[in-house]
Amino acid sequence: MSRVSQARSLGKYFLLVDNMLVVLGFFVVFPLISIRFVDQMGWAALMVGIALGLRQLVQQGLGIFGGAIADRFGAKPMIVTGMLMRAGGFAAMAVAHEPWVLWFSCILSGLGGTLFDPPRAALVVKLVRPHQRGRFFSILMMQDSAGAVIGALLGSWLLQYDFRLVCSAGAALFIACAAFNAWYLPAWKLSTVKTPIREGLGRVLRDKRFVTYVLTLTGYYMLAVQVMLMLPIMVNDIAGSPAAVKWMYAIEATISLTLLYPIARWSEKRFRLEHRLMAGLLVMTLAMLPIGMTSSLQQLFTLICLFYIGSIIAEPARETLGASLADARARGSYMGFSRLGLAFGGALGYAGGGWLFDAGKAVGQPERPWLMLGAIGVITFLALWWQFSPKRSASGMLEPRT
């Protein structure tokens, strides 16, 4: 085995360990924020939605700058600093008794993610060969699902005693992850050339094909982020206990671990990436439309199963498609900008979803937010269909800029 092949192989194992620590640290805390502050402390869902939206907007919206800085200075210092900032955000969240403290903690957590997320994504593109990326993204997502369940189980158990223990566990995991990266991550450069920050930013912004794709995904993410806000609240409301939320993540893990990789392997040989993304989005949309009209936990979990099936169809294709459109001369900048759709979609999905949930509850129309999200899913599906239509591909709109 050549030194390059050996480095790629060891790098992939490093990425898997790193990813598990990050996923555990995140899911110990974030799925329980809505339970803690809406159900236990009686805050309006809008207040919590704003907090979650701020974290999403800061982390993903500023990701292009984090990626551009990583292109210039390398991955390691950005990742270690960002993970320590995320731990600090969790520490602040532990003492949040006013909305502004929760907002501050989420902003700090988001700033940490701004620093570590784009270089981590760029390392995947650097270390995994193009023909292997779809399968590797599938493995990462299976790991995400397993980590989500373990994290949510740990967080739910700790929440019975004290929310401060939940935040402490999350902070400890991110500190451990920072130490792991500081000790084991080589001083790798992300791009094929040492790209100045301004040049990396400009290269992305001139790529009309990539910019259009990223912004189109805003609607997709408005649906996807509800696993952190409205779905846990719905499960808790119908079940009458926050302990039921862990079963939602158990469903996700079961579906992901049993179906994600086989579906990805089967579909990558038969369908184009954009068609897989659109098919998954359509399934997610159909699952969301009737959620507000469900009255039993069995019905709700059935729809959640369908939603997760759509997600595992779409997610590997979305990640692989984004990576395939990136320019190797500015990987960090591209991976940072690719998070902008999640920034906008997350902020709108959290804040808008929280507001719609409160408004629907106040007027006795609990189905309102879910119907609105379903409409957004349909619009996004049509936008993707338009973007990847044969006529637009033939016109050069989807061709790389030179």
Curated annotation (Swiss-Prot):
Membrane topology annotation: Multi-pass membrane protein
GO cellular component assignments: plasma membrane
Keyword Transport found: yes
Regions crossing the membrane: 13-33, 34-54, 99-116, 139-159, 165-185, 214-234, 243-263, 277-297, 300-320, 340-360, 369-389
Keyword list, A-Z: Cell inner membrane, Cell membrane, Membrane, Transmembrane, Transmembrane helix, Transport
Alphabetized InterPro entries for the sequence: MFS (IPR011701), MFS_dom (IPR020846), MFS_trans_sf (IPR036259), MFS_Transporters (IPR050171), Multidrug-R_MdtH (IPR022855)
GO molecular function: transmembrane transporter activity
Gene3D superfamilies in the record: MFS general substrate transporter like domains (1.20.1250.20)
Domain of life: Bacteria
Locations listed in the record: Cell inner membrane
NCBIfam families: PRK11646.1
The family this protein is said to belong to: Belongs to the major facilitator superfamily. DHA1 family. MdtH (TC 2.A.1.2.21) subfamily.
Protein name: Multidrug resistance protein MdtH
Source lineage: Bacteria, Pseudomonadati, Pseudomonadota, Gammaproteobacteria, Enterobacterales
Gene (name only): mdtH
